[in-house]
């Protein structure tokens, strides 16, 4: 609830590091925001929600004439992919679309995302907990590490993506 996102400690490491200083060493000591107002913004982070995925293989392959050379094929695929992605989000500026090739370029899927850019650090354990065991224990089970960090997604008053603003509110899933 309230827009919380849990991820691995190493995935949040750069954000934790960017907020750290000699005075406030959040990597060494950890971080906890005891109120919404103390959560730390992260301008380089965003969270993407997958809205839908669609198989567009037929539309992509129909645009490629039989016998097309590989270099020309790549240009056609790139061009039609751009067009399909633009069509998919033409009526909604809050969405982003991309075409991904699968199986060596024999299948193509359109994915539509909604990106939230106001993401704030809520909690991070000290690195001694979040990275306990280091690479030695990374692929060994059972693991005994607190490998997590917590962020919160914020949205505008209509629960839509927005740039950082103190007026934004925690995101609530539909």
Residue ranges and their predicted role:
Residues 1-174:
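Terminal presequence/propeptide segments associated with secretion/organelle targeting
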